[in-house]
Amino acid sequence: MGKNRRVVITGMGAITPIGNSVEEFWNGIKEGKTGFGPITYFDTADYRCKQAAEVKDFDPAQYMDKKSARRMEQFCQFAVAAAGQAISDAGLDMEQEDPYMVGCSVGSGIGSLQAMEREYDRLKEKGPGRVGPMLVPLMISNMAAGNVSIAYGLKGKSLNVVTACATGTHSIGEAYRTIQYGDADVMIAGGTESSITPIGIAGFSALTALSFSEDPERASIPFDKERNGFVMGEGSAIVVLEELEHAKRRGAKIYAELTGYGCSSDAYHITSPAEDGSGAATAMLNALKDGGVAPEELTYINAHGTSTHHNDLFETRAIKLAFGEHAYDLKINSTKSMVGHLLGAAGAVEFVTCVKEIQEGYIHRTVGLRETEEELDLNYCRDSYEEEVPYALTNSLGFGGHNASVLLKKYME
């Protein structure tokens, strides 16, 4: 069938550190609200990192029955909740759809560390015969897509992409390709994560990837010269992607159009992006080429922007490499300045942000940004902007050199 089918966004859902719906999340974004605070899940007395961006007031009973909730770890509960919101928002009635043409592409970078920690303790204390029989289906990352498909009767292609911090963006991009090539008419797509656990925080701390700041206002400060690591977040964002004519036939509202997807691999280092930015630059240019958009037509990028020294520097180099002098005309922001780094869900949350920015003509500021260093000399949005956003490019860069960019545009007939 080729790549000639247009793909639009018709529904969105979000469980985030600043709100448990798209409306709450977006209002928080416009207010410059941050979700950072002391870790409450465990005692951090022996940890250098004491801050995280936890989801607040989440009640799985609002989205599923008790039996289902017990058979899911939190990363799956977040995904099922956000997917339910998105499907409801889209007005998608599965009884009216061919279930084999409605698929699922929901990824998690890590799966459930909670289940692994809990059952490992049981193994050490009581022996191998006492390890719970549900450990494996509870912890493996593909159960996010599995549980979403089970919960909503999605019988089409079901994917679980695992590309670390690029998971959410790859998941949406692969769902987009699935619809383009005619393998589905509708895809439920996004990412989810819940890794604020003792081993999760200890592991990322050992990498020196996390901020050790105890001041929530100076913990996640992408592109600032005082940046010292990311703040771990959690949550999920899910979107309904739909073939345009299918959406029009059922009278669906259309938020925006997904029009380009680009990927690359740095083939450079297990944690660091390529220093020259060439891999990320290639992903961005591939997304623009896929969407038929010239680099100089783009005005806005939602950056990966993690608040680590290397990422923000190397992503800046990538933008300059891809856009040349036009890089200085771009507005670039980081949603992680408010919600932290949601790992496998980060790209999906930032995708929802881009949809809302296109819809409302608003580019949010990078909260906490005060002063940059010499090589970081682009416009990283110290202030918000109210202006037309015809296109939005969002980047995700994952451990292992996984790069993904997707291009959205304002929907026009």
Show the residue positions of the predicted features:
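ACP-dependent fatty acid/polyketide chain-elongation machinery
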Residues: M1-S68, E245-E257, V352-T366, K409-E413
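Condensing-enzyme catalytic core mediating Claisen C-C bond formation in acyl metabolism
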Residues: R6-T10, G37, D215-G291, Y300, ...
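Conserved beta-ketoacyl condensing-enzyme motif
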Residues: I9, F25, K30-T163, T192-I201, ...
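A glycine- and small-aliphatic-rich helix-loop capping segment at beta-alpha/alpha-beta transitions
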Residues: E23-G28, Q114-P128, T178-Y181, I201-E214, ...
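Active-site-adjacent elements of ketosynthase-type condensing enzymes
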Residues: A45-E54, G111-A115, S194-S220, G262-T282, ...
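Short, well-ordered amphipathic alpha-helical segments that serve as non-catalytic structural scaffolds
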Residues: A79-A90, A144, S171, E242-L244, ...
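Active-site-proximal alpha-helical scaffold in enzymes
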Residues: A79-L92, S141-A145, S149-E193, V231-A252, ...
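Glycine-/small-residue-rich "gating" segment that lines the acyl/pantetheine channel
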Residues: E125-G132, H170-G173, R177, E193-R249, ...
